[in-house]
């Protein structure tokens, strides 16, 4: 049996550990990682029926979170107009500068882009690694671009084909590329060389004209790259672009998944390596473009933000 003196020494020795344990119990939990949101075409940062509602849903489930919903312009109306007419590269530069100056983001942040905001935030991840983006969630983003108009009657329609060809005839002109946002991610699978040489945004971030190693390194630094596809999407054509798939080159009928594209097989962006490492997450939901239920959002998106 230990003597009283030995027990006293043991108690003294354990005292610092006991105090430390109690102190740790009273420490505040770490603040949740901030969230940056970029809205889609024709929307604004703070529409109570869209991004405003998303912000409230996130704040409800993650108390204390800092949510920055990007406003591109000085007014809500300007924000909406810029989603159509402000050069995408200029928008990305402006956002990168704003994020770098925000003291609440310096330890890292998650990002969630809706529709075209998905590929715009990917450009931020690739071009602006500081502050670091941790998870990127693309909700209906078009990462291989679009080659079709909203709610066309169908792939076999001669009218749709005619409209596509007409738009494509001017989509890659310098003036259109500089002034029309949607032209900057217009991707013609029939004239890949024209797209590759004249697309000032999408062809660049998808490494179509050469390999920018920093783009690849920065994208691969993401913990998770989550892509949400809408199974009944009537806006995005082809809908496979929401999972980084696209039309097979040379035609506009058959689509192929990401894993069969040259972007993946040549691993120009590191997507193949990310896929093998479990960094890519492919989610699908019923409904039309950006039609998400609260229940689905809470179950499938919130876990990547907590």
Swiss-Prot record:
UniProt cross-references to InterPro entries, sorted A to Z: AB_hydrolase_fold (IPR029058), Palm_thioest (IPR002472)
Effect of residue 219 to Q: In CLN1; juvenile onset
Pfam families: Palm_thioest
Protein's cellular compartments: Lysosome; Secreted; Golgi apparatus; Endoplasmic reticulum
GO cellular component, one term: nucleus
One annotated GO biological process: positive regulation of pinocytosis
Active site: 115, 233, 289
Result of changing residue 6 to S: Does not affect its subcellular localizations. Increases depalmitoylation activity
EC assignment: 3.1.2.2, 3.1.2.22
Assembly mode: Interacts with CLN5. Interacts with ATP5F1A and ATP5F1B.
Family: Belongs to the palmitoyl-protein thioesterase family.
Protein name: Palmitoyl-protein thioesterase 1
